[in-house]
């Protein structure tokens, strides 16, 4: 995928988002992630980074690595807040995620962007647990635009709506507001 990401980043920066999708070019990602690649293409062009150099590849992997780190931070925060873990226990939870070989290999080595999707799903779940419906809907929509695999979590969103809106003193207003 990293070779596709490199080509797509250059293409979307060169031709623009409006002309990016065409019959001549293989693109199997939705437009959300293409805007991330647009920024990478712009940075590469602005800084004169050689195509497919080590720095270019690092730039392409950076969104996934940053999302891995954000997931680790969220796990730390939630372990402390919701589970009432001690600071050291929360650090262990975050490290258990951040240093598992699958996470490191997937993002840092292979260059896959599954952690972008993972971060979106975690955020959606946290917003649903807090009864923050509009942010949950927005994050879900962004997730679908980033990776269509987010659709797999539609039942989670629907159960959150059912729980918050219909099972707790029904009100249509709660469909949109806390």
Place the predicted regions along the sequence by residue:
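Extracytosolic helix-loop segments that constitute the early lumenal/periplasmic catalytic or substrate-binding loops
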Residues: 2-28, 32, 40-50
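Transmembrane-helix motifs of polytopic, lipid-linked glycan transferases
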Residues: 58-84
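Membrane-embedded alpha-helical segments of multi-pass membrane proteins
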Residues: 62-70, 115-123, 143-150
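Specific aromatic-rich, kink-prone transmembrane helix
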Residues: 74-77, 116-133
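Short hydrophobic alpha-helices at membrane interfaces in multi-pass membrane enzymes
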Residues: 87-91, 127-141, 170-177
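Short helix- or helix-capping micro-motifs
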Residues: 93-99, 140, 144
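Short acidic/glycine- and proline-prone juxtamembrane loop motifs at membrane-interface regions
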Residues: 108-116
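Perimembrane helix-loop-helix junctions
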Residues: 153-178
């Amino acid at each position: 995928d990293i070779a596709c990401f490199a080509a797509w980043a250059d293409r979307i920066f060169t031709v623009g988002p409006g002309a990016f999708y065409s019959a001549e070019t293989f693109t199997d990602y939705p437009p959300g992630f293409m805007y991330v690649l647009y920024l990478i293409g712009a940075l590469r062009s602005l800084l004169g980074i050689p195509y497919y150099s080590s720095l270019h590849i690092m730039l392409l992997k950076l969104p996934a690595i940053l999302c891995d780190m954000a997931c680790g931070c969220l796990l730390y925060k939630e372990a402390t807040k919701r589970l009432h873990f001690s600071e050291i226990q929360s650090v262990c939870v975050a490290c258990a995620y951040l240093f598992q070989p699958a996470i490191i290999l997937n993002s840092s080595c292979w260059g896959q962007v599954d952690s972008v999707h993972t971060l979106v799903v975690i955020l959606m779940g946290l917003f649903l647990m807090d009864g923050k419906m509009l942010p949950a809907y927005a994050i879900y929509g962004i997730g679908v635009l980033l990776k269509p695999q987010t659709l797999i979590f539609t039942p989670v969103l629907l159960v959150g709506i059912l729980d918050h809106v219909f099972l707790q003193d029904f009100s249509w207003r709660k469909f949109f507001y806390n």
